[in-house]
Amino acid sequence: MALRRCLPQYSTTSSYLSKIWGFRMHGTKAAASVVEEHVSGAEREDEEYADVDWDNLGFSLVRTDFMFATKSCRDGNFEQGYLSRYGNIELNPAAGILNYGQGLIEGMKAYRGEDGRVLLFRPELNAMRMKIGAERMCMHSPSVHQFIEGVKQTVLANRRWVPPPGKGSLYLRPLLFGSGASLGVAAASEYTFLVFGSPVQNYFKEGTAALNLYVEEVIPRAYLGGTGGVKAISNYGPVLEVMRRAKSRGFSDVLYLDADTGKNIEEVSAANIFLVKGNTIVTPATSGTILGGITRKSIIEIALDLGYKVEERSVPVEELKEAEEVFCTGTAAGVASVGSITFKNTRTEYKVGDGIVTQQLRSILVGIQTGSIQDTKDWVLQIA
């Protein structure tokens, strides 16, 4: 995955991509010199949709056409980015990501509206969250503009993989990792920013059905002073065994407690959690061990606009018994109703279905994301 010279701007190739792939770049600049190497002689892929069973999408990887990549220069700035065919990448065995876990991920979605527009939801927040994470992990990061441009190029190059309206979304995975070699414990000398996508539908196997969570009492997800508040790749490996055990017992996912006291709920494996009690919506405060989710932030703002009282604070695990509704939020999960939570062999059930607060919040959020509800907050970025 060799990159060209280090330039602050992207190379201009919108006319080439428009001619070959049948889409307009809408101001986004792509890297034709590298793309041409990969697509010359290839069959046209200008049909509106890829050959996918859109009615049976899950949340597993579907190989799309292109990915985007760029690398950092010696001064920490990033080179011009380029699109290449989706495929494997080459890494030095001494790369920082392999030896010392220097890596961050993001999760985003591109939606196709009923009017055919292709939309991104608050991409600048993902870009800023990656920059914050990069500071914590001692990494160089792309600028907000570079981040968004890379995401836009990825979506436009894979436009036929954006599902039809109401059939799902194109999940986007921006990655930032140490690709430079280092034998001793040290920050990498070079970083790679990469974006790929995959069409998806529901994150949980339950689909839109309510989730069944299990409270993990022994193994915490994050520790004070650690990396729980950023989207570091190292946050996810340690919870895989906990998730596997819970799912083998029939649970959808795991709800973790704080490492300090073991008495307060924090978050699910890859989602934030909310409790509904009357007109009050409660969620654990993001105090360094909990990821500040973008869906979480958006739901809080929507709830406040609707007149609900929102409390961000420590939430004792015993308070789960007082909730009328519980729901999870995340880019992958969306807004997912929780039907029950099991703690110390005691199962507490919650309201689910139509007419509940969770459904109201979900409908508004999805409406804004897909363009069916007017975006009065300037949250949505139209890219096609």
Curated annotation (Swiss-Prot):
Cofactors, names only: pyridoxal 5'-phosphate
GO biological process per UniProt: L-leucine catabolic process; valine catabolic process
Tagged with keyword tRNA-binding: no
A Pfam family annotated for this UniProt entry: Aminotran_4
Catalytic activity: L-leucine + 2-oxoglutarate = 4-methyl-2-oxopentanoate + L-glutamate; L-isoleucine + 2-oxoglutarate = (S)-3-methyl-2-oxopentanoate + L-glutamate; L-valine + 2-oxoglutarate = 3-methyl-2-oxobutanoate + L-glutamate
Post-translational modification N6-(pyridoxal phosphate)lysine, affected residues: K231
Entry's EC annotation: 2.6.1.42
Residue interval of the organelle targeting sequence: 1-18
InterPro entries with a match to the protein in the record: Aminotrans_IV, Aminotrans_IV_CS, Aminotransferase-like, B_amino_transII, BCAT-like_C, BCAT-like_N, BCAT_family
PROSITE patterns xrefs: AA_TRANSFER_CLASS_4
Location in the cell: Mitochondrion
Gene Ontology CC annotation, any one: mitochondrion
Pathway(s) of this molecule: Amino-acid degradation; L-leucine degradation; 4-methyl-2-oxopentanoate from L-leucine (aminotransferase route): step 1/1; Amino-acid degradation; L-valine degradation
GO function term, MF aspect, one: L-isoleucine-2-oxoglutarate transaminase activity
Keywords (A to Z) from UniProt: Aminotransferase, Branched-chain amino acid catabolism, Mitochondrion, Pyridoxal phosphate, Transferase, Transit peptide
Keyword Transferase recorded: yes
Other observations noted: Branched-chain amino acids are synthesized in chloroplasts, whereas the degradation takes place in mitochondria.
UniProt function note: Converts 2-oxo acids to branched-chain amino acids. Acts on leucine, isoleucine and valine.
Protein family per UniProt: Belongs to the class-IV pyridoxal-phosphate-dependent aminotransferase family.
PANTHER family per the UniProt record, alphabetical: AMINO ACID AMINOTRANSFERASE (PTHR42825), BRANCHED-CHAIN-AMINO-ACID AMINOTRANSFERASE 1, MITOCHONDRIAL (PTHR42825:SF35)
UniProt-recorded name of the protein: Branched-chain-amino-acid aminotransferase 1, mitochondrial
Provenance organism: Arabidopsis thaliana (Mouse-ear cress)
